Amino acid sequence: MKICLNTKIAGWYAACIFLQSCAAPADKKTIENITPAAYYSAADFTKVKKYDTHVHINADDSTFIDQAKKDNFRLLTINVNSGHPIEEQRRIALILTKKFHDRLAFATTFNLDNWGTEKWQPQTIAYLKESFEKGAIAVKIWKNIGMELKDANGKWVMIDDARFDTILNFIEKSNITVLGHLGEPRNAWLATDSMTIAGDKRYFTEHPQYHQFLHKENPSYEDQIRARDNMLSKHPHLRFVGAHLGSLEWNVDELAKRLDKFPNMAVDMAARIPHLQVQSVKNWQKVHDFIIKYQDRLVYATDHGVEPKSNFAEVNKEVHDVRISDWKYFVTDEEMTVPDFSEKFKGLKLPKEVIDKIYLTNAKKWFPGI
């Protein structure tokens, strides 16, 4: 009995230390005193060990991983409740993590089969438990919760629904990270010609079912964010990474409010760096200072990946070019352009210490076992 109690106390103490370390903002004086030697250059790209914590590798092919090796990246491949059956995604992930154990980790997910019945919770916990035993270091929760799932009465089911609490509690007790893609970028609720990013215009044109501007009956953008925030309030010790800048990509001030409120929350940058860049056009200093202040809560990621029918050479060139552009934005102060919008902007030239956190140490901190 004493041993169990001590273990619980130790676990509680460790959780407290983790949350305290997340809540503490960077010391601004330290950053201001950085010397020129403490900055990386564009030429350092391949020299620095890095993580891309959000990719989707759904083909038993090594070329995507080979490209990561050339770019000096380790990867986290994400299973998601969309497309291929989740069991097949896990099978591929296990093959590849065995082959490339020093280069690749994987995140599992769960499906919604039998939702609303007595079978759903036990089957979900059983699948997650098996995934953790096979090496999964995170659980992906996808936007179909909040955007597609309805109960038997036709009511929308959001992530703060009490029926998810048992699952979230199990994940927390297992010391596993939740990666949550909940909601969509705010552009999804705008007309296409009002969207700020070309990539969003293209995506929502190709996937009109997620273009919420066309579906006024669906939950609002604010509903999505509120449900996610409610879930975090109910689970203050759940280690949570909000995918895609936590669907708050449009305004660093709004994202800062959540990072202040929820010390157990970080965000990945997958497919949302152009949203930071477009904000840099109007207020470079605000974006720069935001990243400095929340340098312990930001994790680099791209959201690239491969499918069995992918043109691997094209995908590898695209992800390499994106990584090079992102690196230039973060480490230099050069004038830049990107395909997502026409305006020019300046790189952020972040100190080495900050770059190392975004690309390396934060991945290890928020995804233990990566």
Please identify what each model-predicted range represents:
Residues M1-W12:
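Bacterial N-terminal signal peptides that target proteins for export
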Residues Q20-S21:
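C-terminal motif of bacterial Sec signal peptides marking the signal peptidase cleavage site
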Residues A24-R103, P122-Q123:
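An N-terminally biased module of ancient metal coordination in phosphate/nucleic-acid-related enzymes
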Residues A38-A43, R91-P219, A266, I273:
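Active-site gating/metal-coordination segments in enzymes
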Residues Y51-V55, L75-I78, L104-T109, V139-I141, ...:
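Hydrophobic faces of well-ordered beta-strands that scaffold small-molecule active sites
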Residues H54-S62, V80-Q89, D113-P122, L149, ...:
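Acidic-and-aromatic substrate-binding clefts and catalytic sites of carbohydrate-active enzymes
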Residues K216, S220-N230, H235, R239-I370:
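H/E-rich (His + Asp/Glu) clusters that bind or coordinate divalent metals
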